[in-house]
Amino acid sequence: MLFRSRQIVKDQDQIIEHIADALQRNDLILVLHNLPAGNWDGGERGVACLPGRENEFQEGVGHAIDYATALRCPQVNCLVGLAPKEASGDQVRRTLVANLRFAAKELKSAGIRLLVEPVNSIEIPGFYLDRVEKAVSILDEVGSDNLYLQYDLYHQQRMGGELLATYRRFKDRIAHIQVADNPGRNEPGTGEINYSFLFEALDRESYKGWIGCEYKPSAATSAVLGWASSHLRKEGKATREQGAGR
């Protein structure tokens, strides 16, 4: 079993030197990390849509650029946050659009791609971008050529399914895919999602990005990697990645 890359969720809890050393020792590359997401332990899941937190967001972008540059990470994901009840919908949207324009421009200057991720609002009530269609409307309004979707198949399944149809509809906007099965958010093969069908379809669609394994292993990590054996490409072709769960 061979994984060639990693993704990590919270950069602020990691020391760059330690991560760089671990990547080198294990012959891995880092392909994605998240922007700072506010007070995670306090329930925040991003600050990009929070009016009044713009300075914090911009500082986080600078921090993410330093972090990604040092670790040669080509893309950064933005969790946009929970819509604050005290703000109007228009205010929340304007704040998010302005912040994403800022981040996309700054990251582009550093040669780093910006992603946003729709997250299901069943498990995280109030998450502002809970559907792919809404996220794409934000991308359109931002109008940047450096802003893409992170398409999490588990979140899409929770919010309505149509996994392949949704991919095909928005594939030009999708730069990164994540997997987990439903119910339980465990490894592929433990639930209702037909990943053999989906992986074959993604190959037919010539998907070129990474696929992050953002799931909760149902047993020890190494004990449940068998699902990937038939899906990993042979040497010389793209391989899937293993990532941390949110």
Question: Model-flagged regions — what are they?
Answer:
Residues 1:
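Extracellular interaction modules
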Residues 4, 8-94, 208, 217, ...:
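Structural motif corresponding to the early beta-alpha repeats
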Residues 12, 36-38, 80-84, 118-122, ...:
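Active-site-proximal loop/turn and secondary-structure-junction residues that shape catalytic pockets
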Residues 14, 41, 84, 124, ...:
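Active-site-proximal flexible loops/turns
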Residues 19-39, 96-109, 133-144, 198-201, ...:
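Alpha-helix-loop-beta-strand connector modules within alpha/beta enzyme cores
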Residues 30-32, 116, 151, 213:
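Hydrophobic residues in well-ordered beta-strands that form the structural core
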Residues 45-148, 158, 238:
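Active-site acidic/histidine proton-transfer and metal-coordination neighborhood
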Residues 72-73, 129-151, 155-246:
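Histidine-acidic metal/acid-base catalytic patches
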